[in-house]
Regions:
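Extracellular glycan-modifying ectodomains
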Residues: 1-371
Length: 371
């Protein structure tokens, strides 16, 4: 009998001891501000484990905070910047869901370390005078598996990728079923405010933000964090980013992009590809080898040969940085900055407007021929 009481007391003490640790994640998710323990809005709003939600971020959110670059956060090298984020009902970084031109891409298209008005979608929208929708981070397969774009397709889809990720772009159909399944579950969650709140809260609990921030601080204090930095610029990969690509690799990548063109054209949608040069590419003279990569010029030449529309950002970026001394990437981050976005939007807008006028002339000529 005495032993039973002792066991019960021990269990009670253990429960009381564990209670704060069990309740804290719930308190963190349900009561505290989402950005209390994060260094960027990205970590605050990004979906962690609830991959049944329709988008990569929590829907219908607004966050304004001071954040730092991904390569040297909470260090003397960090460049602090106040940014604003809005997400739409589907969990993508947009103020609304209107879509004439749709951008598919990675975190550069989302606008990491950029404020909402500086993102490519908003800058391009102002320059084009058309509604531009940011569908990022996402893939062409996610787009093809999303019902709302079947019902209301955009006029143009621009697929963009940072140079180092181009070789990883999935072929059409590679993740088709997964994209359709997530679209179905996401639609169901979006249809209910209660389900949306439950999904977001459960996901925030799974993040364990304070725990992860504490581990990161311990690692920075006692660990041996190695930074890739040359001449006071931080890089994500350094020299390996400027590796050589074989002709076989180049053709395989071109096959994937040509597949995007055919898949979108079969739906009556124009396809344009816009690569974004690596920081290591444009800043290659800062690296020890000073080697200038040739991957993007070779890829663009191959795509033009296949009559795949491609926008050349590299030439403009090289001119801005090398001839006009305009920095195109933050010191502490691998993503492009607002000046690079402005330049890319200008090139893309000019390309799309020229393309529009050509299509209009072709259509008029076709009508005349039929008459």
């Amino acid at each position: 009998m005495m032993e039973d009481k002792g066991v019960k007391k021990l269990l009670l003490k253990l429960t009381l001891l564990a209670l704060p640790f069990l309740l804290w994640p719930v308190l963190e998710a349900a009561v505290l501000p989402g950005n209390l323990f994060t260094f960027r809005v990205w970590e605050t709003l990004s979906v962690n484990s609830m991959r049944v939600m329709s988008g990569p971020f929590y829907p219908n959110m607004y966050v304004k905070m001071e954040e730092e670059g991904e390569l040297a956060p909470h260090t003397p090298f960090a460049e602090k910047r106040v940014v604003e984020w809005y997400t739409d009902p589907y969990g993508y970084r947009n103020r609304d869901t209107k879509t004439d031109v749709l951008l598919i891409g990675d975190s550069n298209i989302t606008g990491a370390k950029l404020s909402q008005e500086e993102t490519l979608a908003e800058v391009l929208e102002r320059q084009l005078g058309k509604d531009v929708y940011s569908f990022a981070p996402a893939t062409v397969n996610r787009f093809l598996g999303t019902r709302r774009f079947e019902e209301n397709p955009p006029e143009v889809v621009v697929v963009s990728s940072i140079e180092r990720r181009i070789a990883e772009l999935p072929a059409v159909g590679a993740t088709g079923m997964g994209a359709k399944l997530r679209d179905m579950t996401g639609t169901a969650i979006n249809s209910s405010k209660v389900l949306t709140w439950l999904a977001v809260t459960a996901d925030r609990i799974s993040k364990l933000a304070l725990y992860r921030r504490t581990l990161a601080q311990i690692d920075r204090t006692f660990g041996k964090k190695e930074y890739i930095a040359y001449q006071n610029e931080f890089f994500l990969e350094g020299e390996p980013a400027n590796r050589d690509f074989s002709e076989e690799e180049l053709k395989r990548i071109a096959d994937v992009l040509e597949g995007y063109k055919h898949a979108l054209e079969s739906r009556g949608i124009r396809f344009v590809f816009m690569p974004i040069p690596n920081k290591e590419n444009i800043y290659h003279q800062l690296l020890p080898s000073r080697k200038k990569p040739d991957f993007l010029p070779r890829l663009m030449a191959e795509l033009k040969q296949r009559q795949v529309d491609v926008v050349d950002t590299q030439s403009t970026f090289e001119n801005l940085y090398h001839n006009e001394n305009i920095p195109l990437y933050p010191v502490d981050d691998a993503h492009w900055n607002e000046k690079a976005v402005e330049a890319a939007a200008g090139i893309l807008a000019q390309y799309l407007q020229h393309d529009d006028s050509e299509h209009t002339r072709d259509a008029r000529q076709l009508v005349k021929n039929q008459e």
